[in-house]
Each structure stands twice: as C-alpha cells, then as structure tokens.
Amino acid sequence: MISRRDLLLQMAAFPFLATASQPRTPIKFDVPPGACDCHTHIFGDPKRFPMTPSRVYTPEPALVDEMRTLHRALHMDRVVIVQPSIYGTDNACTLEAVKQLGSRARAIAVIDVQTPGSDTMLADMDAAGVRGIRLNLETSGIADPAVGSQRVRAAIDRLRGSRWHIQMNTRLPMIDAIRAQVAGAPVRFVFDHFGGAQAPLGLDQPGFRSLLDLVRGGSAYVKISGAYRSSTQAPNFPDVTPFAKALVAANPQRVLWGTDWPHPDSATVAGRKNTDIAPLLQIDDGALLNQLAVWAPDAALRTRILVSNPAELYGF
C-alpha cells in the first residue's frame, strides 16, 4: 500500500505531473437538461482510501470537487461513478463520492462474483446508489475466452433476479466469444469504450459485428466513451466516427455517453512499477463532447443518449 507521504514524495519528485484535466474547448451544442456522464472514476486520498497491493497502476488523485468543475463546464446534471480497478472490491471511495453528490449520482461496484455473498450486502449497496457490477477483464489482462466466459457466468448467477446490470471492460474478441451468453442472459450488459474496438482496424475487425448485433437486439448497451482508447487521432478522433455512427444506427436506445474522466493511464508501461505514479492523461472533454454532435447530429437522438437511456438504465 502506498502511503500519502510516499505519494506526495513521488509527486514532488515529478513536478510536471498535472492534475485531472478540465475541458479546454467550449461546448458547441445545447446539452439537454438531465444529461448524464455515464463513465467516470474518483481517486481519493490514499490515506483514507488505500489501494489494493495487486493493482496494475497508481493514479494521481481525482476528487469530487474537480468532477463538479468538469460537469459544470460540460453542462452535465448527472453522473455514473465506476469503481476503478485500483481499489479491488473495496468500494468505499466510490460510494463516498456518490454520497457527496447525492441523487444526481449512481455507481457501478466491483464484487467478488466467485464467492457467494449476501443479498443484504447487495440491498445495502443498491440503497447507496449502486446499479451494477463491473467485470474489468481488460485491466486484469484476461483475454482467454474460457476464463472470460466463466467470469460472465458467475456474474450472471450472482445478479439473477436483481435489477442490476453487468458492465464489462473488455475487447471485441471477448465480446465475440461470449455473444451467446450475453444474448441469452436474464440480466442486462453494458460494454465500455466502444467495446474495445480499435479504430485503425476498421469496421470489419473481428467482434464488431457481434457487438452491433447485441446492441441491435437490445441485449447490451454500449458506451461511446474513451475515444482516445480506440484512436490516436487527437483531439477529435475522426476515425472513431464510423464506429459511433454504426452503433447509434444499430439501436439508439442502447447507447450511452461518458467521458472516462479523469482518464487514468492504466496501460502496462515498460519499467513502471505498479506503485509508481501513473500521470492522468490530459484529455479535452469539451472536444470529446462536441464529437457527439457529429456522431448523433439529431438533437432528439442526443437527448435519447444523454438523458433517456441513462435515466432508464440507472434509475435516475
């Protein structure tokens, strides 16, 4: 566990480290009332919210007040805070953030789906604003379809009969492998960040058709979020546009939008230990939100994506 003293020492040793990014580009369309940023994280004071020793990376802090500033600039009224991998199954930081933000916030938690848990625990978390659990196969380095399928099966069994959904951070080959499981599941699925599509590989890359089919059939939602994880063409990531438009065309009732703020650098970096500070990526969320008007030019479609879909899925 990294102590606050160690964190401050590391930050002092690297004075170029920036704080969580804020939008630099003004929003160029009318954001509808009730709009929701469906993908964010909070990284709290490490002394109060210790990170799991097995984490892949150590981010800089990103606090609730910084998120409030972000959302004022983006005209976002609602937010979904997703439990990051650095805390494992200790959801305290995420739940504290939801508590601070009140009824405008919901959470996605991480639980141990391999171990039977109590329904009371889920009920308590539901009352605190949790609406689903996350399977973060990507950050965990899980690419084996057999392992992924087993995790999905355990998660389905754990949530059977509840109103929660399963949110997955994975890549298209995994989605292709679990397509039948998702389509036949008694719970809803949400795939992060374009399902892990890589823009340079084009629309015909393996697995994207499976994602489209799941979205089209209503079995899964997809977040058109974190475009910089699919593309290197900053700041507008134009090569992501065909993917976003294809997903919106497939089923606009199953599309969500999110920033992925504060943009953690969770990738494995040669020579960087998991306890070394991984500077937050400096992403212009104003430019990213403006791209939604390119991906969904119709104002009614944007209202569906930003307001109606999140309200239905997260129970705002």
PLM ranges: what are they?
Residues 1-14:
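N-terminal secretory signal peptides and thylakoid transit peptides that target proteins
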Residues 8, 21-89, 275:
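An N-terminally biased module of ancient metal coordination in phosphate/nucleic-acid-related enzymes
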Residues 21-28, 205-316:
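H/E-rich (His + Asp/Glu) clusters that bind or coordinate divalent metals
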Residues 36-40, 79-82, 107-109, 133-135, ...:
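Hydrophobic faces of well-ordered beta-strands that scaffold small-molecule active sites
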Residues 51-57, 82, 132-147, 274-278:
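Glycine-rich phosphate-binding "P-loop"
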Residues 63-66, 90-93, 117-120, 175-176, ...:
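Alpha-helical scaffolding within the catalytic cores
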Residues 68, 95-96, 179, 212, ...:
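Active-site phosphate/pyrophosphate- and oxyanion-stabilizing loops and adjacent acidic/basic residues
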Residues 86-173, 180-183, 216, 221-235, ...:
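Active-site gating/metal-coordination segments in enzymes
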